[in-house]
From Swiss-Prot:
Entry's EC annotation: 2.7.7.56
Molecular function in Gene Ontology: 3'-5'-RNA exonuclease activity; tRNA binding; tRNA nucleotidyltransferase activity
Protein name: Ribonuclease PH
Quaternary data: Homohexameric ring arranged as a trimer of dimers.
Length: 238
């Protein structure tokens, strides 16, 4: 029996609260069960030096965890004087995922920074970050159109992510912390709304997994992401 009695293919309750803060062009509080992440999208005119004069935009991301988002306090990375490898890996993943959602040429020379701050962690913080940041990004792009800075919206479609894994020999979707810490296989999957794969990060923590198990996990992820995308679209429709 999984925590909260979920079936193996069932994601946790997903909530997306838009306009959570007042200053950012897009802001969303995303909740995957007890995992809560604040995602903001900020627009700046101009692009990084390596893109100047090319007539296209850029999307980047930063990720961080509040000191007491976990069971025991972790010092802020600013206090340590440098970002950890995990943080850099996750924020690059978020940026790659969200660049796949946008026509960067149609964006023009704007940079959008997605800030994902974990308020409470109970597994799946990176997948929640991608899911919430996509909605914040959609709101920010809508503002560019509403303000007359873009003629057409460069958003190509929604992007969402979910964790899957093998726990106690069974393939399950959207792992909570207690499952994640005991998983034999742990995988994060990012997809477009039509089921195309953007990224798969998979690791055998114990016993190596088979090709058949990989296909099972990808199918579980697709089903979970379809449900999450429906929640994203419902949030944007309100």
């Amino acid at each position: 029996m999984r925590p909260a009695g979920r079936s193996n293919n069932q994601v946790r309750p997903v909530t997306l609260t838009r306009n959570y803060t007042k200053h950012a062009e897009g802001s969303v509080l995303v909740e995957f069960g007890d995992t809560k992440v604040l995602c903001t999208a900020s627009i700046e005119e101009g692009v990084p030096r390596f893109l100047k004069g090319q007539g296209q935009g850029w999307i980047t991301a930063e990720y961080g965890m509040l000191p007491r988002s976990t069971h025991t306090r972790n010092a802020r990375e600013a206090a340590k004087g440098k970002q950890g490898g995990r943080t850099m890996e996750i924020q690059r993943l978020i940026a790659r995922a969200l660049r796949a959602a946008v026509d960067l040429k149609a964006l023009g020379e704007f940079t959008i920074t997605l800030d994902c701050d974990v308020l409470q962690a109970d597994g799946g913080t990176r997948t929640a970050s991608i899911t919430g940041a996509c909605v914040a990004l959609a709101d920010a792009l809508n503002k560019l159109v509403e303000n007359g800075k873009l003629k057409t919206n460069p958003m190509k479609g929604m992007v969402a992510a979910v964790s899957v894994g093998i726990v106690n020999g069974e393939a399950v979707c959207d792992l909570e912390y207690v499952e994640d810490s005991a998983a034999e296989t742990d995988m994060n999957v990012v997809m477009t709304e039509d089921g195309r794969i953007i990224e798969v990060q998979g690791t055998a923590e114990g016993e190596p997994f088979t090709h058949e198990e990989l296909l099972t996990l990808l199918a579980l992820a697709r089903g979970g992401i379809e449900s999450i995308v429906a929640t994203q679209k419902a949030a944007l429709a309100n």
